[in-house]
Amino acid sequence: MTNSPLIQFNIKKLIDIKMFGLDVSFTNSSIYMLLASTLALTYFYLAFYNRKLIPSRLQVSAEIVYNFVVDMLNQNIGIKGRKFIPLVFSLFIFILFCNLLGMTPYSFTATSHIIVTFTLALLIFLTVTIVGFIKHGMSFLTLFLPQGTPVWLAPLMIVIELFTYLAKPVSLSLRLAANMMAGHVLLKVIAGFTVSLMIYLKFLPIPLIVILIGFEIFVAILQAYIFTILSCMYLNDAINLH
């Protein structure tokens, strides 16, 4: 089991903490989530601390990321989505840094665990629900009955739409966790296989590993984007009642 590709996902307690009968121990997952947050804050602090008319490369890169998220909100929600920029931007950056941090050797990918991704998805789900009821009141419930639905079909459609709505945080969290775990497992397996091939082919298999790492970095960025854009679409449903 020492060579199992799943060992990299093991949760290890570093500081055992019990509060009110609950286990809130500080783990390797906690460290990497804290590290991802610290790196993100440091990056944007350095980028915007001393803003210049002629921006530095660091400032340009940070502005590109910020404008990317703002454009995502504008395209999916419109001007009404401006107030959600802090939430959506923080969500995207946190997932992105957790995903990329997990690509470093001997690190830990916090977003490969369903408890982490489900917590993020639940945050979006609760926000969408609360915003929907605040903005539309009980009319928000019309979201579960598409316009033009025949009366005889209405009960079935309400059940289906309600089930679909409740399944959103589950599918959102599973998609991110499953993709991050699958990618890391595949990379671990192929890397081990490549080491064996090097006995016979010398350094020829190394380009394969480089390509796979590049692809996994692309997937890490893509999954952060998918999670965020789906969150924007859910917010749009609540705000514009689609």
From Swiss-Prot:
Alphabetically ordered keywords of this record: ATP synthesis, Cell inner membrane, Cell membrane, CF(0), Hydrogen ion transport, Ion transport, Membrane, Transmembrane, Transmembrane helix, Transport
Keyword Cell membrane (UniProt): yes
Xref: Gene3D superfamilies: ATP synthase, F0 complex, subunit A
Alphabetical list of PROSITE patterns matching this protein: ATPASE_A (PS00449)
Record bears the keyword Transmembrane helix: yes
Membrane topology: Multi-pass membrane protein
GO CC, alphabetical: plasma membrane; proton-transporting ATP synthase complex
Main localization (coarse): membrane
UniProt-listed Pfam families: ATP-synt_A (PF00119)
Disulfide bonds: none
Compartments, record wording: Cell inner membrane
GO molecular function: proton-transporting ATP synthase activity, rotational mechanism
Transmembrane segments: 29-49, 84-104, 114-134, 140-160, 181-201, 203-223
Highest taxon in the source lineage: Bacteria
Subunit note: F-type ATPases have 2 components, CF(1) - the catalytic core - and CF(0) - the membrane proton channel. CF(1) has five subunits: alpha(3), beta(3), gamma(1), delta(1), epsilon(1). CF(0) has three main subunits: a(1), b(2) and c(9-12). The alpha and beta chains form an alternating ring which encloses part of the gamma chain. CF(1) is attached to CF(0) by a central stalk formed by the gamma and epsilon chains, while a peripheral stalk is formed by the delta and b chains.
Family: Belongs to the ATPase A chain family.
Annotated function: Key component of the proton channel; it plays a direct role in the translocation of protons across the membrane.
Protein name from the UniProt record: ATP synthase subunit a
Organism of this sequence: Rickettsia typhi (strain ATCC VR-144 / Wilmington)
Phylogenetic lineage: Bacteria, Pseudomonadati, Pseudomonadota, Alphaproteobacteria, Rickettsiales
Gene assigned in the entry: atpB
